[in-house]
Amino acid sequence: MRRAAWGAAVVLMLTGAARAAPPSAGRVELVAGEGLNEPFGVEFDRESRTYIVEMGGHRVTVLDAKGARRVLADDFKGPHHLLLGPDGALYVTDTWNYRVRRFDLRTGASTVVAGTGEKGFSGDGGPATAAQFGGIFSIAFDKRTLYICDLDNRRVRAVDLKTGVVRTVAGNGEKGVPRDGEDARAQPLFDPRAIAVDVKGNLYICERGGHALRVVDPAGRIRTVAGTGVAGMSGDGGPALSAQLNGPKHIFVEPSGSVLITDTENHVIRRYSPRDGTIRRVAGTGVLGAGGLGGPALECALNRPHGAVIHPKTGALYIADSENHRVLRVPRDQ
């Protein structure tokens, strides 16, 4: 599969009122943006619907294939992330209600799959629905497991999708920098904010406070792959371990295996390549702003983005440009 390239791609704002140009220009008819309140994440279902989680709006908004908009649910408290599960249901992190909710997209029924609704740390070895979490900011899936980024407890926990039992897979609850090559469960984490899993079973952990990207291999060993640990903006085009990040908030594993890092406080989207260990900027100028719509992705200013994902069918890059209260689409170069 050829990697998507966006360096010279056109950036489109998806507004609530406007309709995009014909697809011959690489544009699609999507509706989003106007009326949004701090969009933090974007997801797509198998019926070409788009889902936007609004942290400030405490809701999930749905856009159908024709652009019609509706609210899926609006009874969250600061939701940060959403993800389609292997069962086709939509899972949402109800962050400050300390739980994960599952939505059956056929019936609209909602159930809690993890968390009691009270903040704390308990429940490993038992049902996830009876376990306490300390702020659920991100989730990830493989075929058998729901992974939960338990930020305030400085742990990543895993729920067996068959049994519903929860356990810790990374983090010992302490705040610190983990040692490379050690058992991830015995090591500290530095404010783990987001997680993602690749097809090889590697679990990536994005640390907001550690300004770094870690990875836990299938054997359970952790190591740092990006970031010096000091906040800053440097290193594009070179080794990721020599680059500076600044409060990254989201990660997404591309089909190629590369990892998109939403480098929030630098107002950019960056790509880490595990093949050669390099990092580079793919969207955003590095300066807070809102200008540049209609131009190259690298010349489009962002304002504290909190999510970046790839559309599974078109290969386009979608950015939750949170403090600009909009969603951006960057078409894949043809």
Residue ranges and their predicted role:
Residues 1-7:
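Bacterial N-terminal signal peptides that target proteins for export
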Residues 44-47, 84-87, 141-143, 197-200, ...:
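Residue-level detector of Asp-centered blade-edge/turn motifs that repeat once per structural unit
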